[in-house]
UniProtKB/Swiss-Prot annotation:
Keywords: Disulfide bond, Endonuclease, Hydrolase, Lyase, Nuclease, Signal. Belongs to the ribonuclease N1/T1 family. It catalyses: [RNA] containing guanosine + H2O = an [RNA fragment]-3'-guanosine-3'-phosphate + a 5'-hydroxy-ribonucleotide-3'-[RNA fragment]. PANTHER family: EXTRACELLULAR GUANYL-SPECIFIC RIBONUCLEASE RNTA (AFU_ORTHOLOGUE AFUA_4G03230) (PTHR42104:SF1). InterPro entries: N1-like (IPR000026), Ribonuclease/ribotoxin (IPR016191), Ribonuclease_N1/T1 (IPR051386), RNase_U2 (IPR048269). Its EC number is 4.6.1.24. This is Guanyl-specific ribonuclease T1. Residues 1-26 form the signal peptide. Monomer.
Length: 130
């Protein structure tokens, strides 16, 4: 009897467990190279960068957040000036050290301009994440 209940429970839960990877894939709102970010990841990174910008503080040897000049000519839907801030594939908020390849770009009004990456770009340029 107990074995039968356990088998039934396992049979019911197994399809749900197998479906979980597809749920994770659907949470990918931005793809930068092979890195996947949810809107929540982007919002968290943006909030951290904007708070430092507002406080007049920076972190890391490249002094993030710093002005982003948009030399690539991206057609952002929000007005400049723009600032760039690292978004880390680990999910951690950047606090110094290697910034990785990916950035959130926001403006003076804390509006998200876009998510960009050095991955797949030539030299020190950026390409837009999809």
């Amino acid at each position: 009897m107990m074995y039968s209940k356990l088998l039934t429970l396992t049979t019911l839960l197994l399809p749900t467990a197998l479906a979980l990877p597809s749920l994770v894939e659907r949470a990918c709102d931005y793809t930068c190279g092979s890195n996947c970010y949810s809107s929540s990841d982007v919002s968290t990174a943006q909030a951290a960068g904007y708070q430092l910008h507002e406080d007049g503080e920076t972190v890391g040897s490249n002094s993030y957040p710093h002005k982003y000049n948009n030399y690539e000519g991206f057609d952002f839907s929000v007005s400049s000036p723009y600032y760039e801030w690292p978004i880390l594939s680990s999910g951690d908020v950047y606090s110094g050290g290697s910034p990785g390849a990916d950035r959130v770009v926001f403006n003076e009004n804390n509006q998200l301009a876009g998510v960009i990456t050095h991955t797949g770009a030539s030299g020190n340029n950026f390409v837009e994440c999809t």
